[in-house]
């Protein structure tokens, strides 16, 4: 099975600029991963969403790169998943584009 979580949007502290360390900004997260499904073994995607949001808000990452590395490790340790693809975007940091990083 493959789970897709698209356009997970919320505000958190992320970035290295002075104003980014004070004011929360919108981030958008997209991810997908595979896992071995059976009737008694499944992944609750609402728990995955909550874990991502709580982690991003708690850790207050300076770099998107650090957030991706941290979340990748956390998700792989928490769940039996394969082929995790993770993308984090900061849609409001620049006026004329959306900045994103992915693994």
Language model features: what each stretch is:
Residues 1-103:
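N-terminal, polar/charged subdomain of small-to-medium soluble alpha/beta proteins
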């Amino acid at each position: 099975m493959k789970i897709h979580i698209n356009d997970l949007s919320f505000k958190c502290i992320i970035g290295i600029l002075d104003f980014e360390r004070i004011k929360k900004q919108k981030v958008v997260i997209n991810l997908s991963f595979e896992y071995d499904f059976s009737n008694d073994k499944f992944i609750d995607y609402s728990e995955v969403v909550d874990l991502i949001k709580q982690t991003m808000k708690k850790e207050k990452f300076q770099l998107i790169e650090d957030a991706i590395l941290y979340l990748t490790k956390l998700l792989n340790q928490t769940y039996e998943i394969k082929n995790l693809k993770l993308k984090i975007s900061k849609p409001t940091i620049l006026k004329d584009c959306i900045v994103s990083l992915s693994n």
